[in-house]
Amino acid sequence: ASLRLDRYRAFLVRDLNQTIYHQSYALRFRLRHMPRRGEESVYTGTLSGLALGHGTIRIDMDSVPNEREGVTILLRNPVSPEAWRYSREHSKSLKLESKDLLDPLVDGVNQSPFELLMPFVFWDATYEKSGRVAGRPAHVYRFSCPEWVREAQPSWVRITLALDDTYEAPLRVETFSNRSVSHKIFLLNSLKKIESTWIVKTFDCKNRADSSNTRFEVLSAALQLDLDPILFAPEGLGRELTIPPEAFLSTK
């Protein structure tokens, strides 16, 4: 079981120097926030990286509240998380603190950069059990929260991760406080095969406190791209991510 987790850790931070060509990707996505009561809100954007599953991620939001133009977020190095936020309106890039990873990706939604970067995978881990999660055989690991998380979220005690037995991909992530019931759940809903590659199509991020759900849905995908690595560096966040529309294949 520990070897399985070690393999997944290594996959997230693998060296791309030898395999960077034709590995880049871009996913057009929709964030749909569904509160228990009230109106839904929808945001769109592009998530991209130098290789699927790697721990360097760029997120270009088309529009966000309180900004006339969209913003770009760079996440990297889940072992020691780093993040930057670039405002196209102000042409300025700001390095974020670790605790900022826990803030919503967009005001009012459940999804945060934390769920996308998954730094907890590298925290102290304990194997809990095997069983079925989302209808699939899985292995569940428990992670203790480090000091920077406890300072930002004092109620958080532990996080659990369910890895698929066959594909070694995350099926479910749960965040626990002192209670035995999780207060936040990240759940994989569906996958989609684009040509010969399986990608995530939808996952939910549920908040038990207010019974809301934010659904991340991939609308189209462009794979096997050659993207300039500078796009995934802090100094390159002001550069536009330009990908021909015909490169995107629908997930419908």
Indicate residue ranges for each PLM-predicted region.
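Flexible, processing/modification-adjacent segments and terminal tails
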Residues: S2-F11, I20-Y21, E39, E67, ...
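A short, Trp-centered hydrophobic/proline-enriched beta-strand micro-motif
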Residues: Q18-R36, I57-I59
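Amphipathic hydrophobic-ligand
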Residues: E39-T44, S180-H183
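Mid-chain, structured segments of secreted extracytoplasmic proteins
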Residues: T46-S80
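Beta-turn initiation residues at beta-strand->coil junctions
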Residues: L31-H33, M61-S63, R85-E89, C145, ...
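Gly/Pro-enriched, hydrophobic low-complexity segments
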Residues: L105-D107, Q111-L116, A134-A233
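Extended lipid/amphipathic-ligand handling interfaces
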Residues: V13-R14, G45-A51, R76, L187-K193
